[in-house]
UniProtKB/Swiss-Prot annotation:
A Pfam family matched in the record: Photo_RC
Principal cellular location given in the protein's record: plastid
Job description of the protein: Photosystem II (PSII) is a light-driven water:plastoquinone oxidoreductase that uses light energy to abstract electrons from H(2)O, generating O(2) and a proton gradient subsequently used for ATP formation. It consists of a core antenna complex that captures photons, and an electron transfer chain that converts photonic excitation into a charge separation. The D1/D2 (PsbA/PsbD) reaction center heterodimer binds P680, the primary electron donor of PSII as well as several subsequent electron acceptors. D2 is needed for assembly of a stable PSII complex.
TM stretches of this protein: 41-61, 125-141, 153-166, 208-228, 279-295
Protein name per Swiss-Prot or TrEMBL: Photosystem II D2 protein
Binding site for pheophytin a: 130, 143
PROSITE patterns linked to this entry: REACTION_CENTER (PS00244)
Gene: psbD
GO molecular-function terms, A-Z: chlorophyll binding; electron transporter, transferring electrons within the cyclic electron transport pathway of photosynthesis activity; iron ion binding; oxygen evolving activity
């Protein structure tokens, strides 16, 4: 029996091969198969955001002005979430709410669902782009894995959280001041800053910033002075084969500073990857918990003692009072459709009053 070894070659290219050749061609801006998802979705998400912040009011959904046309600036303009009465409707332009009327669609908050969904798929497309290019140039896919952190946060905050609540209304609107309002809402209604998942997220993000600063400074401190140039940027050939800084010197330095130091570059750089990505993922998991209205830490014994003893107060009990204030003041302002009216006696006051 004869076994023929060799690569099977087709006589003529089919449509897939033709598209593959064109999409993955070496050009100034790589397109790739991921580009079929990334570029249209990113274009529509950004275009929808610029359109909404420029022209579209939030009067019908939040009772607010939210566009440049109404007098907002870059910090106060936003693409606002749909009204609470629309629940979790996808708000398709041709759906039963807008019925093909573009103006009405914008008034109802259709641009928010448009931007949120296209934005989510654009982020996923960008991660797939990193996978695709890494595979093409034979790199490992850790860039794409790292980018899963921001995707997890976006999806949990903008999609999963409102899905767990009564509607898209409770998601963040796409704007700077709108995000700040959402943060205050999270604190007042969920005590988010005392949530351990938020603590891990803060530790991850700030820890990553510290690691970046330390790493950059250490590399700059231990550069080999073997170039002719006068400064860092002129002294080295970008194609040189040898390393540009001394890991041994850096190790000795930090061993003296802390008593411990990274002994190899692989562990060092993996740690720099692990800290922020894990922090972002933990924060995203915490937001999923909030979508289900899971409580954070409750130190009930301190609350009971503070209620019984006017002279006993902790930073925790002070924060609980602040949260009650946020809820009492924000609920009426933020959910005008509920017609909430709080009598004076239920508004929170300090223990001393």
């Amino acid at each position: 029996m004869t076994i023929a070894l060799g690569k099977f070659t087709k006589d003529e290219k089919d449509l897939f091969d033709i598209m593959d050749d064109w999409l993955r061609r070496d050009r100034f801006v790589f397109v790739g198969w991921s580009g079929l998802l990334l570029f249209p979705c990113a274009y529509f998400a950004l275009g929808g955001w610029f359109t909404g912040t420029t022209f579209v009011t939030s009067w019908y959904t939040h009772g607010l002005a939210s566009s440049y046309l109404e007098g907002c600036n870059f910090l106060t303009a936003a693409v606002s979430t749909p009204a609470n009465s629309l629940a979790h409707s996808l708000l398709l332009l041709w759906g039963p709410e807008a019925q093909g009327d573009f103006t009405r669609w914008c008034q109802l908050g259709g641009l928010w669902t448009f931007v949120a969904l296209h934005g989510a798929f654009a982020l996923i497309g960008f991660m797939l782009r990193q996978f695709e290019i890494a595979r093409s140039v034979q790199l490992r896919p850790y860039n794409a894995i790292a980018f899963s952190g921001p995707i997890a946060v976006f999806v949990s905050v903008f999609l999963i959280y409102p899905l767990g609540q009564s509607g898209w209304f409770f998601a963040p609107s796409f704007g700077v001041a709108a995000i700040f309002r959402f943060i205050l809402f999270f604190q007042g209604f969920h005590n988010w800053t005392l949530n351990p998942f938020h603590m891990m997220g803060v530790a991850g993000v700030l820890g990553a910033a510290l690691l970046c600063a330390i790493h950059g400074a250490t590399v700059e401190n231990t550069l080999f002075e073997d170039g002719d140039g006068a400064n860092t940027f002129r002294a080295f050939n970008p194609t040189q084969a040898e390393e540009t800084y001394s890991m041994v010197t850096a190790n000795r330095f930090w061993s003296q500073i802390f008593g411990v130091a990274f002994s190899n570059k692989r562990w060092l750089h993996f740690f720099m990857l692990f800290v922020p990505v894990t922090g972002l993922w933990m924060s995203a998991l915490g937001v999923v918990g909030l979508a289900l209205n899971l409580r954070a830490y409750d130190f009930v014994s301190q609350e009971i003692r503070a209620a019984e003893d006017p002279e006993f107060e902790t930073f925790y009990t002070k924060n609980i009072l602040l949260n009650e204030g946020i809820r009492a003041w924000m609920a009426a302002q933020d959910q005008p459709h509920e017609n909430l009216i709080f009598p004076e006696e239920v508004l929170p006051r300090g223990n001393a009053l």
